[in-house]
Amino acid sequence: MSGGGKDRIAVFPSRMAQTLMKTRLKGAQKGHSLLKKKADALNLRFRDILRKIVENKVLMGEVMKEAAFSLAEAKFTAGDFSHTVIQNVSQAQYRVRMKKENVVGVFLPVFDAYQDGPDAYDLTGLGKGGANIARLKKNYNKAIELLVELATLQTCFITLDEAIKVTNRRVNAIEHVIIPRIENTLTYIVTELDEMEREEFFRMKKIQANKKKLKEQEAAQKALEGPGPGEDAAHSENNPPRNLLASEEDNLPVLFN
């Protein structure tokens, strides 16, 4: 039997092994197709997140610039109120909660900023500069929400990048390693089975030829040895000896009348 130098799975060539390899090949091809679709979906989401990151970073610069101007205006009209805010801080009003979004089997973290309870500084700037302080709070709240959204996008970007790399490695492994190995194994099994069938056919023909030759030799040997004693007795019973006198008397000419 041929050994085969190609990379293949070590199996004994049989019909059962051929069926199992066909099943494994079908499963590998289906898995390859599903992983390709998963990689395409992840790449689509990855590009969408990348576009949003670029847009949010541009928007973030404008929002932070507007918030900085609002802070300068509020300090100009209401004076330095930072010590008042620091003294009255008990807990953060804006909190961040996290949830997970499933994208074709990859869980992406999503951060959400929300205000916990009523605004404790609603009356800040009531004496002077109230409008500027209100605008300041609004701008910084917008900046916080945008920062949280940007953090979500960047975290999803990193997670998707790693998931895409892993998926592509799996796709390449199935396409260039697993499927060729199974195909080489199937080729080896089919070749070995065909060779075994040819060997079996040749062996059967050889056995038949030997039997025929043996029969011919036995027949020739019997012909050389002649009939046996049993065969002579049977021949005598079937063909009794002739009466030569009786036959000769019948054929004698009549000499006397």
Swiss-Prot record:
Any single GO CC term annotated in Swiss-Prot or TrEMBL for this entry: proton-transporting V-type ATPase complex
Highest taxon of source: Eukaryota
UniProt cross-references to InterPro entries, sorted A to Z: V_ATPase_D
Annotated GO MF terms: proton-transporting ATPase activity, rotational mechanism
Disordered, as annotated region: 215-257
GO biological process, one term: regulation of intracellular pH
Presence of the UniProt keyword NAD in the record: no
Pfam families: ATP-synt_D
Record's keyword terms, sorted: Hydrogen ion transport, Ion transport, Transport
Quaternary data: V-ATPase is a heteromultimeric enzyme made up of two complexes: the ATP-hydrolytic V1 complex and the proton translocation V0 complex. The V1 complex consists of three catalytic AB heterodimers that form a heterohexamer, three peripheral stalks each consisting of EG heterodimers, one central rotor including subunits D and F, and the regulatory subunits C and H. The proton translocation complex V0 consists of the proton transport subunit a, a ring of proteolipid subunits c9c'', rotary subunit d, subunits e and f, and the accessory subunits vah-19/Ac45 and vah-20/PRR.
Record's function text: Subunit of the V1 complex of vacuolar(H+)-ATPase (V-ATPase), a multisubunit enzyme composed of a peripheral complex (V1) that hydrolyzes ATP and a membrane integral complex (V0) that translocates protons. V-ATPase is responsible for acidifying and maintaining the pH of intracellular compartments and in some cell types, is targeted to the plasma membrane, where it is responsible for acidifying the extracellular environment.
UniProt family annotation: Belongs to the V-ATPase D subunit family.
Database matches in NCBIfam families: V_ATPase_subD
Listed name of the protein: V-type proton ATPase subunit D
Organism, scientific name: Caenorhabditis elegans
Lineage: Eukaryota, Metazoa, Ecdysozoa, Nematoda, Chromadorea
